[in-house]
Amino acid sequence: APDGGSAAMCYIFDSLQQNFLLNKGDKIVLFAPVFTPYIEIPEQARYLFNVIEIKALKMTKDGYHTWQYQEKDLDVLKDPSVKAAFITNPSNPPSYGLTKALMNRIVEIVRNDNPNLMIITDDVYATFIPHFRSMMAELPKNTLCVYSFSKYFGATGWRLAIIALHQDNIYDRMIRELPRDKQELLKKRYSSLSLHPE
């Protein structure tokens, strides 16, 4: 359990890089609006990711902002050079969840075009949306989920969050498929934590 959602983000970025799943300069997608650390962290010198933003620009005919994404903008996720997508769902600060149509489109793209896409979903505002459904429920093998207790319990001072990952996931598989030299480095790194670090 990390020290709140912000710390969880730092651990996730570091872990993905330290385990050779994201490399400096890799393409990632940020769904905006987004909690600001997701904007700031990728620009730090140790990451310098190539960030592509998908903005929630959809509006109704009478000019009401729906805080949803245009389906055509999701096509950027088809590109296998896009390694990860960071989604704050429900959005922060507007607190709008992804529509079922958008969720279905993301699922379709991952299954048909980019099966190794790592999805990091920040579900901290989930309790504010009736009948909320996380990306983790739709794409459990691809999704890392961040959840913080501060919003639900109104206790921001607690600084307590969780990072959830399905037991059967692409992250472990991609680590197993790394070149032998990188696997050896990881085996050495984790040997103090596990009798079987492989």
Annotate each language-model stretch with its function.
Residues 119-120:
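Residue-level marker for buried hydrophobic side chains located in beta-strands
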Residues 123:
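Walker B catalytic acidic pair
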Residues 1-114, 126-140, 144:
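Conserved core of the PLP fold type I
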Residues 142-198:
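Conserved core segment of the aminotransferase class I/II
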